[in-house]
Every structure is written in structure tokens, then in C-alpha cells.
């Protein structure tokens, strides 16, 4: 099993960091009560044309009786179609919040 999939299955600091950060940003002033649900976000992988895979990481966040639902999108891009894959990562750095319970968040992505 390759390292990337092990990270998805068993957890990785990069994923854990992004799992909890939006909760804190999206809660009200009592941010310390923010707790991400579940241990590892449920993840689905969809393959698209031109060797691009998109990883969707979904999880719920509960704070002050409000449940926020997040979708974090990771991209990995196959460079020049090489057999030894070289990946370029783009992180989602902006998260948008809503006070509506169970609202689905679709963050925009930045190429940073």
C-alpha cells in the first residue's frame, strides 16, 4: 500500500490539522468548545482526466450545539505523465461558515 493511502487510512498530522482548524475559526467567541467529530474524516477519491486525482475530505464539526459540515478538497496532479509520479499539492486555505445547522460548506481553493 502506498504511503499516501496509508495517510488517509491511519491519519496524518496534515489532515488532522485541517480537520480541527475550521471548527475553531467558524465558532463564536467560545471557540474552545469546538470539537471535530470522528477520528479520521471520511474520504472519497475520484479520478479525472489528465492524471489528476481529487481527494475530498468530509467531516462534521460541533460547536455550541451547532453542527458544521465541511468538505476539504485536495488536488494531486500528475506531472508530465511520468511513470514515477510527481505530485503537486494545493491546499484549501479558506473555509466558509454558516450558522445553519448541517449546512454544507464548499471552500474555494487557493494554489498556494
UniProtKB/Swiss-Prot annotation:
It comes from the Eukaryota. Almost completely overlaps YOR378W. This is Putative uncharacterized protein YOR379C. It comes from Saccharomyces cerevisiae (strain ATCC 204508 / S288c).
Amino acid at each position: 500500500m502506498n504511503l499516501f493511502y496509508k495517510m488517509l487510512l491511519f491519519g496524518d498530522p496534515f489532515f488532522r490539522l485541517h480537520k480541527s482548524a475550521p471548527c475553531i475559526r467558524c465558532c463564536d467567541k467560545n471557540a474552545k468548545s469546538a470539537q471535530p467529530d470522528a477520528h479520521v474524516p471520511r474520504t472519497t477519491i475520484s479520478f479525472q482526466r489528465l492524471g489528476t486525482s481529487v481527494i475530498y475530505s468530509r467531516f462534521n464539526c460541533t460547536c455550541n450545539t451547532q453542527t458544521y459540515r465541511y468538505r476539504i478538497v485536495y488536488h494531486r496532479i500528475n506531472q508530465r505523465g511520468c511513470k514515477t509520479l510527481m505530485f503537486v499539492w494545493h491546499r484549501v486555505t479558506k473555509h466558509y461558515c454558516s450558522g445553519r445547522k448541517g449546512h454544507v460548506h464548499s471552500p474555494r481553493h487557493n494554489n498556494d
